[in-house]
Amino acid sequence: MAHLKRLVKLHIKRHYHRKFWKLGAVIFFFLVVLILMQREVSVQYSKEESKMERNLKNKNKMLDFMLEAVNNIKDAMPKMQIGAPIKENIDVRERPCLQGYYTAAELKPVFDRPPQDSNAPGASGKPFKITHLSPEEQKEKERGETKHCFNAFASDRISLHRDLGPDTRPPECIEQKFKRCPPLPTTSVIIVFHNEAWSTLLRTVHSVLYSSPAILLKEIILVDDASVDDYLHEKLEEYIKQFSIVKIVRQQERKGLITARLLGAAVATAETLTFLDAHCECFYGWLEPLLARIAENYTAVVSPDIASIDLNTFEFNKPSPYGSNHNRGNFDWSLSFGWESLPDHEKQRRKDETYPIKTPTFAGGLFSISKKYFEHIGSYDEEMEIWGGENIEMSFRVWQCGGQLEIMPCSVVGHVFRSKSPHTFPKGTQVIARNQVRLAEVWMDEYKEIFYRRNTDAAKIVKQKSFGDLSKRFEIKKRLQCKNFTWYLNTIYPEAYVPDLNPVISGYIKSVGQPLCLDVGENNQGGKPLILYTCHGLGGNQYFEYSAQREIRHNIQKELCLHATQGVVQLKACVYKGHRTIAPGEQIWEIRKDQLLYNPLFKMCLSSNGEHPNLVPCDATDLLQKWIFSQND
C-alpha cells in the first residue's frame, strides 16, 4: 500500500513538472518577444515626438501585448483563485465618493466666529444708528460718503466679525442635506477691489471664512485693480498673513473688473470659481447650495439670492422664514440689467425654496461656475474694458450656448447697493457703450438694431467700426454651435417685449416753436407727465417710436406710450400688446402734414406751451403746436 502511494505521488510530481516546465518555456518566450517588441516600437516614432509621448505609446502597446499573452496562457494555470471583479472605466469628471449625506461636522467652517456683543454697533445685522455727531465725526462721515458712495463711517464702527443673528431662511433651506455623491466641488472665492474701504473689504473676507466649509473653500483670491490708497498695500499684506488661505494678486495699472476677474481665474486652483464683490456679507449656508447645483449640472451658472445691505445704516435685510416674492434678472433695450417678479410658470415649476430659479440674465457681481466650464464657454470677452455689459453678454452666451443661468434662493449673500459708482473710468463712459456693442454684434443678430436706435454712442461706434476684433468671440459661437437670439427670446425670455424691428419713425420729437424736445423725465416708469427739455440727440429719455398702431412709444425699459388727457399728456403703459388687443383713443396720434400731432379722440393737438406738453385746440399757425420727428444724431 505504501509503495502504491509513492508511485501515485511520483506520477503527480512528474505530471505537474512537465506542466510547469511548459509554462516556464511560454513565459521565457513571452519575455524575449516583449523585448523585441519594445525595440521595434521605439523606432516607429518620429524624432519630433516628445519622450513622454513615446513612453506612453510604448507602454500602451506593451500592455496590450502582455494582456493578450496573459489571456492566452492563463487557461494553462491551475484554477486555484476566483478572479476579482473587473472595474468599469470611470468618467474623468467623477471622483470617488461615499454614499449618504455630508454631516454638520464635515461642513464645519474654516474659522469659528468669535463671541459677539449683542449691543455692539450693527450686531446681528441690525442698523448702525447714532443720534449726534461731533463736527469732526460729521466731516469724517461726509468724506467717506464722497469717496465710497456709502456710509463708511458706519461701516468702520461695525465689527469685521459681526454675526447676522439667527438663521432666518425657510425651514427647507436650513434642513437641506447635501449628497456626498457626486461630491461637492471645491471653490476659489475671487474678490476684485479698487480703492475699497478697509472695513467693507475685510468684513467680506471674514464673512467668507466664518460661513464657508473648510473642505470646500480652497482659497480666497483678492485681486487689486491698481488701488492707490496706502492701506490697501503693505497694511493689507500684513493683515492677511494670518490667513494662509488668503492671497493677493495685483494689477499695476487700472484695467477694470473684467480683466481683474480673468487674472483671479487664471491663478485659481479649485474646481469652481466663486466671484464676490468687495462689499458683501455671506449668510449661513450660502456656499453649499451653489456648489451642489454645479455638482448636479456642470453647465449651471448659479447666483445667490442677493440681500440688500443698507448703504447708510449697514442693516442686513435678512431672508424671510416663509420664503419671499423672489425676483429674477432681465434686460431692457438699452442693454441695462434690471429685476422683475417671477412669471407664474416659474412659480409653479418650483416645489419649494430649494429649487433653483431660472433667470434670463444675472447681475454678474456674485456667482459660482465650474472653472472648466468657465473656460469652455469663453470666460469673459478679453477686449471688453473696465466694467459694463459683461453680465448681459455672459447671460446671453450661457443660455444660447447650452448652459443654464440660475438663482439659488437658499444661498443668501448681502451686498451694499450704491446709488452711483464712486470710481472714474480711465477712458470715460464710452467704454460701456463699446462693451455693449461687442455683445450686441456677436449675440443679438438683427435685434441689435433696436439697441443702436436707442443709444447714439453705440451707433457711432458701429459706424466707425471702433469696437475691436470680434473674430475670437464668433469662433466661440461657432465652436459651441450656439443658438440665435430669436431662440433666446422665444424660449428663455418669452415675456420680453420686443419693439418693432422697423418702426415707422424713430428718434426725438422737437418743438418748432422753441429749442426743446419731448422728454420723459427722470425715473418715469409710467403715470407721470412728460416734460420739455433741451434737445441732446442722445436717445435715452428723448427716444420715441411711432408704431404701425399710431402710438408714440417710449419703449426702452417698459412698453410706455404717450397718453392723452384733458390736461397734460402723460406717459402710461401701452394697452396694445399684440394679438386680440387694440390701442385706445388716448394713445392714438396722427402726424399731420402741417406738423401737428393730433389726437382723434379729443380732437385736439399737442402743444409745447408750458412746463409740460398738453392738449389744446388745433391751430396750424401756432409754432408751439408744430413738431419735428427726427433721427438721433
Curated annotation (Swiss-Prot):
**GO terms assigned for molecular function:** calcium ion binding; carbohydrate binding; manganese ion binding; polypeptide N-acetylgalactosaminyltransferase activity
Q: Which CDD domains match?
A: pp-GalNAc-T (cd02510)
Q: Name one Pfam family in it.
A: Glycos_transf_2
Q: Where is the Ricin B-type lectin domain?
A: 504-630
Top-level EC class: transferase
Reactions listed under catalytic activity = L-seryl-[protein] + UDP-N-acetyl-alpha-D-galactosamine = a 3-O-[N-acetyl-alpha-D-galactosaminyl]-L-seryl-[protein] + UDP + H(+); L-threonyl-[protein] + UDP-N-acetyl-alpha-D-galactosamine = a 3-O-[N-acetyl-alpha-D-galactosaminyl]-L-threonyl-[protein] + UDP + H(+)
Query: Which intervals of the chain are annotated as region Catalytic subdomain B?
Result: 356-418
Q: Which residues are glycosylated?
A: N297, N484
Q: Has UniProt tagged this entry with the keyword ATP-binding?
A: no
Q: Which residues form a coiled coil?
A: none
| Annotated Basic and acidic residues bias | 134-145
Q: Report the record's Gene Ontology biological process terms.
A: apoptotic process; cell maturation; chondrocyte development; chondroitin sulfate proteoglycan biosynthetic process; endochondral ossification; gene expression; limb development; multicellular organism growth
S-S bridge residues: C517-C535, C561-C574, C605-C618
Q: In which pathway does it act?
A: Protein modification; protein glycosylation
Q: In which tissues is it expressed?
A: Highly expressed in the reproductive tract, principally in the testis and uterus, and to a lesser degree in the cervix with only trace levels in the ovary. Also expressed at high level in sublingual gland, stomach and colon, with more moderate amounts present in the submandibular and parotid gland as well as the kidney.
- Which cellular component terms (GO) are annotated to the entry? Golgi cisterna membrane; perinuclear region of cytoplasm
Q: What does this protein do?
A: Catalyzes the initial reaction in O-linked oligosaccharide biosynthesis, the transfer of an N-acetyl-D-galactosamine residue to a serine or threonine residue on the protein receptor. Has activity toward HIV envelope glycoprotein gp120. Has activity towards EA2, MUC2 and MUC5. Probably glycosylates fibronectin in vivo. Glycosylates FGF23.
Please identify the protein, giving its name as recorded: Polypeptide N-acetylgalactosaminyltransferase 3
Q: Which organism is it from?
A: Mus musculus
